[in-house]
Amino acid sequence: MWALRGLPRGGRADCSCKNKILIMIKSCIKIKPVTGGSENHNTREVKPKYLIPSEVENIHIVDAKIEDVRKEIEKKYIENVGQKMQAKATPIREAVILLPDNDNDKNLENLLALNDALKEKYGIQAFQVHIHNDEGHIDDEGKAKYNYHAHVVYNWTDDKGKSLKLGKEEMSEIQTLTAEYLEMERGEKGSKSLSLNHHEYRGYLEIKDKLEKELKQELSEKQDKEIRIKIIENERENKNIGRNTSRISR
């Protein structure tokens, strides 16, 4: 299903690469089931309000639509298992992967190599890759601070249409492979509770930027963790408020 190795170097991925980030950031890959709005968000068919201007274009490579892949998986599952796939099954998953900079050519090449490695080692099949260079925040001086990242969409099933069974060890190995292929420092092992989705990461960058300007130095590892913990706590608190409000409205 994955047929992107032959992408011409002069095609859509051949973009000018300005405003490179020189600060080394740690790798992070966060994998979750796709949602109903994943494809529209990733392709920018529905543009979020928080996008910021970028001199480097996004990359969108789609081998197949999510809906079509799911239909193929469901058909294969019925043929091999003899019954319909459960509605709560998550055969298609999506990774949000932090990128070190906005070098589209290099990042795309590394992402494709990572996809090949994941397919060979675990049977994970990527069928969409989206590189986003237009998210981040504008600081107090009007300068753009970008959150470069990619969304990769996977067929997370075996040749019988059954979901792949990967445990903590395999998921940790995927974190390591991501760091190696993207040529980034690996995120700390066991720090899953401090990982942020890309929306939370945007807020983290904004807070981090302001504090470093106030302190006139880079934040320590301890200070960095404290920011992440606070963001996660606030996110959980907001979710709880939403749940309580919905109960009251009933």
Model-predicted regions and their roles:
Residues 1-250:
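N-terminal nicking endonuclease/strand-transfer module with a His-rich metal-binding environment
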